[in-house]
């Protein structure tokens, strides 16, 4: 048996092998040691025929599902090896085969599968010209997609990340460096498949795919699925081709910064835009909503179609509420179809399918009555599958058991033979009850009873006290107990045979009838999948209508002009979280000839919220939802770029400033005049003058070369003078007022630049020490009153022994003030200088390497460089200094 195990294990080295032995799945050797640790189960051992014992652990077969889910949830694979012949009739070792390989990307059900999220398996194929093809499959729904990608490896990885896949399939020669990024950066399970030809029998799924590259990626994906699942895949849907330029592009960093589907802090749905908009009533509607949010539209006509449909639902309360009530009764048709194809559907699943289908005719009829071309096109070709509803209605019991092997699944009247067996079983038991009464009357023994157990079958039981009353020769002794004797008669044995045969045949026949019924349902899978898409889309549209009415959103107007007009706009999620507290709305009005808003104002005043607000309004508009405003006119944006908040962890090993520059580069390189750019305090990760210079250069480049609608917030108040030289830039600020020495943030956007930053007031709100606040105010007053370097005030620090107060020599002050510095390093203001800063230094301020770098900096002509060239030069010089 161990030899058999090792032979099977050789083909599944990267998976736990669940090896069926009787009522247990056993694991041996390294699998056992690792599984015992991961599953927290007992590790034992068995004799292996040598001096060392074989490590071993096992789980009961009826509880295996839970243990398999635990392992897969941790990123492992599990190969399930079953006994494929009856041990009673087997000659020698029972024949065993792996019947399924369960992986993170091929899980069909379990707690790891969120009902409102897809579980995609990805396959990535790299070509010699540098391009990639990415194919994805959700085995639970049968959905298949494929796209062609170009760009850097990081761009490809981010697109893979956007699919939400937990497992990715590549060929065995795939770059090890890229694999490391997949495992370390994206935490994905890696699998291998070299076959790329479309498997026999699945050619019809790629009829609309003509590009050889795309077919190779799909072929790799399908071959892996077939190899791991080893069963029917009748529910796989035709492959959908998508191109990234068909949708608004939002890179993963921006999606995370905007918290579209999950929050930055908790990585959970609650608190995201998806959380707010999700009023769907079906699981499949929830999945479609998330897909829409991942890929907003850029076709004006399609967006307007959705908006008109949402408006119809908003204006017709009774239609919307009636639709919602019916949708509540619709189960997950996509995943039910998948279970039918996989052969793991049970009677309760089919009952759910029937209950869902009962709602469909009324839903389709209500939508057909609407005077709306989009609605008519949506339901065109949708089949309510009434014949399937009728079939399930007359075949499946109303309260069937979970197991399909326990009987009591099929209704009376569905099958004549089954009805006959049930009649024999039912009447046989009635006959036994009558026999018991008759025997009591004949013998006069009132305590006589007829019973049944699995070992002895039916019997007549008489207590020992009443044995003398039994007629001679009437009964045949069968079993002796302490206080009773059990007997049988020829008549009872005959009936027992009929009853037991009938009950055994009932269970087997019901199982056979159910499996045949399942095959009949398979025929309807394509119709069920089409129906699922129709119902999902209606569900998302009613969800938009429901949230729009509840939150008082308005239908926007899409314009072909490059103008933004938002009156009383709100951040939808912040407003919801405030839960009735006063939210301050803000306008965002950018005419066609106005491209850049330079936003100033104190921290905590709402600059970032205002910027995110515009982005979320834009996303909502382009998925077809009403928006949080009293009036809105928007163009269709092709891309959104954001740099808001702290550094992302997707690109590891880079400083905050470097990540900031890389994201700025991404926007500058890819944005068009139809894009939206949101930059929050660009340049803050380096020194003041470097940051200010870069911020100004970036603003000028966007203004002069790109022309994208841009919100650029900054604490560099010196930049506000750009309004005088850049005719399509406008200063705006978030207002605040001082009352009794305290700052009050009004959260209102107003024209013009901010007059103060109120940073010290924010520090007061954070409850920094009073002495520190007082010192900060003193330094601020000095800074605002002069341009020369401030000599830090000496603060006496008490330790074990009071240190003498440092003496500042007048000649030293004069020397410092007379020194005219041009470099960034020497012009930085020192607020907290130590004793050494008041003394003459014995060694030069700059070493030889630093002097050389300084000389290079002096020669740089920033006005003759592009922002990207400036960033590259800065990065090069910084690396040169760090090497020392």
From Swiss-Prot:
Gene3D superfamilies in the record: 1.10.1420.10, DNA repair protein MutS, domain I, MutS, connector domain, P-loop containing nucleotide triphosphate hydrolases
Record key words, sorted: ATP-binding, DNA damage, DNA repair, DNA-binding, Nucleotide-binding
DNA-binding in keyword set: yes
GO BP of this protein: mismatch repair
Residues engaged in binding ATP: 601-608
Region of interest (Disordered), residue spans: 826-845
One MF term in the entry's GO annotations: mismatched DNA binding
A Pfam family hit: MutS_I
One GO location term (cellular component): cytosol
SMART domains reported for this sequence: MUTSac, MUTSd
Role: This protein is involved in the repair of mismatches in DNA. It is possible that it carries out the mismatch recognition step. This protein has a weak ATPase activity.
Database matches in PANTHER family: DNA MISMATCH REPAIR PROTEIN MSH1, MITOCHONDRIAL (PTHR11361:SF34), DNA MISMATCH REPAIR PROTEIN MUTS FAMILY MEMBER (PTHR11361)
Family: Belongs to the DNA mismatch repair MutS family.
Protein name per UniProt: DNA mismatch repair protein MutS
Source organism per UniProt: Bacillus cereus (strain ATCC 14579 / DSM 31 / CCUG 7414 / JCM 2152 / NBRC 15305 / NCIMB 9373 / NCTC 2599 / NRRL B-3711)
Gene label: mutS
């Amino acid at each position: 048996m161990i030899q058999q195990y090792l032979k099977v294990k050789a083909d599944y080295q990267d998976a736990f092998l669940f090896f069926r032995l009787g009522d247990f799945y056993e694991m041996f050797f390294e699998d056992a040691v690792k599984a015992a640790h991961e599953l927290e189960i007992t590790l034992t051992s068995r004799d292996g025929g040598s001096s060392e014992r074989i490590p071993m652990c096992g789980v009961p077969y009826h509880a295996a599902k839970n243990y398999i889910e635990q392992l897969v949830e941790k990123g492992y694979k599990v190969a399930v090896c079953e006994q494929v012949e009856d041990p009673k009739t087997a000659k020698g070792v029972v024949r065993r085969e792996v019947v399924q390989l369960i992986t993170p990307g091929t899980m069909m059900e379990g707690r790891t599968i969120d009902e409102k999220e897809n579980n995609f398996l990805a396959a990535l194929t790299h070509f010699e010209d540098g391009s990639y093809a990415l194919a994805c499959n959700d085995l639970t729904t049968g959905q298949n997609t494929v796209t062609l990608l170009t760009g850097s490896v990081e761009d490809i990885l981010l697109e893979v990340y956007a699919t939400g896949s937990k497992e990715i399939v590549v060929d065995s020669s795939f770059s090890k460096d890229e694999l490391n990024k997949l495992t370390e950066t994206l935490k994905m399970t890696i699998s291998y498949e070299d076959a790329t030809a479309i498997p026999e029998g699945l050619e019809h799924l790629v009829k609309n795919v003509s590009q050889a590259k795309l077919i190779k990626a799909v072929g790799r994906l399908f071959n892996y699925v077939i190899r791991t699942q080893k069963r029917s895949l009748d529910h796989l849907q035709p492959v959908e081709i998508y191109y990234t330029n068909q949708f608004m592009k939002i890179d993963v960093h921006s999606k995370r910064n905007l918290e579209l589907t999950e929050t930055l802090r908790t990585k959970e749905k609650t608190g995201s835009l998806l959380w707010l908009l999700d009023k769907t009533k079906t699981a499949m509607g929830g999945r479609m909503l998330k897909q829409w949010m991942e890929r907003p539209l850029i076709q004006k006509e399609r967006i307007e179609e959705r908006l008109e449909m949402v408006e119809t639902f908003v204006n017709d309360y009774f239609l919307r509420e009636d639709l919602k009530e019916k949708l509540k009764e619709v189960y997950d048709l996509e995943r039910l179809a998948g279970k039918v194809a996989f052969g793991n559907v049970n009677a309760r699943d089919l009952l759910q399918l029937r209950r869902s289908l009962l709602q469909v005719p009324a839903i389709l009829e209500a939508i057909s009555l609407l005077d709306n071309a989009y609605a008519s096109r949506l339901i065109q070709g949708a089949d309510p599958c009434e014949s399937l509803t009728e079939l399930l209605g007359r075949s499946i019991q109303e309260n069937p058991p979970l197991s399909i092997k326990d009987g009591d699944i099929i209704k009376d009247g569905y099958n004549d033979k089954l009805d006959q067996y049930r009649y024999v079983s039912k009447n046989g038991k009635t006959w036994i009850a009558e026999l018991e009464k008759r025997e009591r009357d004949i013998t006069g023994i009132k305590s006589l009873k007829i019973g049944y157990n699995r070992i002895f079958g039916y019997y007549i039981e008489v207590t020992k006290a009443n044995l003398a009353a039994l007629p001679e020769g009437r009964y045949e002794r069968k079993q002796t107990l302490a206080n009773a004797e059990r007997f049988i008669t020829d008549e009872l044995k005959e009936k027992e045979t009929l009853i037991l045969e009938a009950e055994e045949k009932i269970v087997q026949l019901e199982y056979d009838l159910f499996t045949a019924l399942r095959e009949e349902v398979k025929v309807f899978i394509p119709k069920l999948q089409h129906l699922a898409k129709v119902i999902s889309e209606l569900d998302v549209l009613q969800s938009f209508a429901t949230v729009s009415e509840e939150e008082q959103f308005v239908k926007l107007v899409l314009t072909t002009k490059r103008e933004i007009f938002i009156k009383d706009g709100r951040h939808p999620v912040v407003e919801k979280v405030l839960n009735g507290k006063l939210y301050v709305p803000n306008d965002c009005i950018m005419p066609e000839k106005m491209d850049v808003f330079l936003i100033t104002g104190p921290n905590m005043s709402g600059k970032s919220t205002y910027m995110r607000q515009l982005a979320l309004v834009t996303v909502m508009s382009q998925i077809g939802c009403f928006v949080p405003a009293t009036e809105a006119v928007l163009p269709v944006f092709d891309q959104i770029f954001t740099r808001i908040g702290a550094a992302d962890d997707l690109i590891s090993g880079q400083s905050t400033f470097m990540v900031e520059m890389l994201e700025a580069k991404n926007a500058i390189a890819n944005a068009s005049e139809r894009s939206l750019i949101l930059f929050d305090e660009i340049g803050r990760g380096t020194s003041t003058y470097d940051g200010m210079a870069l911020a100004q250069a970036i603003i000028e480049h966007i203004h002069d070369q790109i022309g994208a609608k841009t919100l650029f917030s900054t604490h560099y108040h010196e930049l506000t003078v750009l309004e005088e030289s850049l005719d399509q830039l406008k200063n705006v600020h978030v207002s605040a007022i001082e009352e009794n020495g305290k700052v009050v943030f009004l959260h209102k956007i107003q024209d013009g630049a901010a007059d103060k930053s109120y940073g010290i007031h924010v520090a007061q709100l954070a409850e920094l020490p009073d002495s520190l606040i007082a010192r900060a105010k003193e330094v601020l007053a000095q800074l605002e009153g002069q341009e020369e370097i401030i000599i830090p005030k000496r603060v006496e620090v008490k330790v074990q022994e009071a240190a003498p107060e440092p003496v500042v020599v007048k000649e030293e002050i004069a020397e410092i003030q007379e020194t005219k510095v041009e470099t960034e390093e020497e012009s930085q203001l020192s607020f907290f200088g130590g004793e050494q800063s008041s003394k003459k230094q014995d060694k030069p301020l700059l070493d030889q390497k630093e002097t050389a770098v300084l000389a290079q900096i002096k020669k740089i002509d920033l006005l003759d460089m592009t922002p990207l060239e400036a960033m590259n030069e800065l990065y090069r010089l910084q690396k040169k200094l760090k090497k020392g």
